[in-house]
Amino acid sequence: MRFYFIYSAGGGAGDWNGVKRVWNDWMPEYMKSRILLKFGDVFLEHASGTHFIRPQRWRKISNLREWLFDNVRDEFVYSHDCNILLDSGTAKAVNLIAHHNPTTNCDKLIDSFNRTFDENDVFEKYISVVCDSEIDSTVTFDIPNPFKIRSQNGNARLNILERKSNDKLIELSAEYSNIIYEGLERAKGSHYADSVITTIINGTWDQHEIDLFLSKLNYNPDKIAIGALSSNSINSSVLKECLDNLAPFRFETASQLHFLGCGGFKKTKTIKEYGFDGDNISVDCSTFINRSIDGNTRGTAESGYFDYISKELIRINPRTVGEILDIHSNIRNPLYTCEELEEILDGVLRHQSGNSSPETYNARAKLMFHNADVYRYNAES
């Protein structure tokens, strides 16, 4: 199983500026050889924004490899060894629409989604970006059920898309997939379209629903992305039931089968034990990012270190530094030496003591690379 490093999946500007600064010296080639980018992260506004798209980025950015290079100044991102998976990131679009329409129902949300995409020529932009960026695998569009939408008053809304609308959503997902495929085919031919399009299938669909979706496609999908399984509500037993529904379709024989957001320790273990393993199977997750930057400058929250072997998270504070270094000293071939890790931990502690600086953000970024390496090791071992 392979692991994709998500670039720009969360955190504030300070943390991602830290990533940019330390990338060249500290990001190992084996980890930056598989990068997941999200179209929504780059081009779509946050839920609280007044626009759907980010106008300046929409106008100026067409090549995401170039955009990534401008951020990290690393020629490697232009090489064929840097495999880029582009996720459409449509959950962000659903979040934005629902945020501005807090009482919307399922049908109205779908109509708003379609209208917004048409008005902004989103599919055309997506196809253009894929072609200009030489993306290796590009995930098609669906209308995902966001796991959590926060309204202005702080209330969380879950599952705004009703189960009874599934057939309509399935047919729309197939329609969107056909639009992407046909656009890629017009731009660069059918061989190119077949080689990059990564058709998203909702992992919670039953076998009838998967059959319905596949029957609506105007092409034979060779790469598959499985979505909707990253929610915390999908525990190991539910995940196994979902895998039972996927198994008859032999998706593991695809040239690539990617489980979106399922790179956490428990889900990776369940997926591998079920039999979905091998170089053509891949995962990603953002947990390593979030735990690395949990700590705040007020000292009321702490960043965490993941152990390669136990997979346990140890919160970083003056009492745990010795324990972390002792654990790390027994790891064979870690990303950082104990001396390098000690310097990183010192920077994290200074940040959490109210002494933030570019150097402390650099330390958090390096911690992010370590935690990502633990998740990579877990997936690939």
Name these PLM-found stretches.
Residues 1-33, 93, 185, 189, ...:
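Alpha/beta catalytic cores of nucleotide-metabolism and tRNA/nucleoside-modifying enzymes
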Residues 1-192:
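Non-catalytic, usually N-terminal nucleic-acid engagement modules in DNA/RNA processing proteins
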Residues 3-5, 39, 43, 52, ...:
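Phenylalanine-focused residue identity feature
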Residues 29, 33, 70, 111, ...:
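Polar/charged alpha-helical tracts
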Residues 152-174, 194-280, 285-313:
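Glycine/Thr-rich beta-alpha phosphate-binding loop at enzyme active sites
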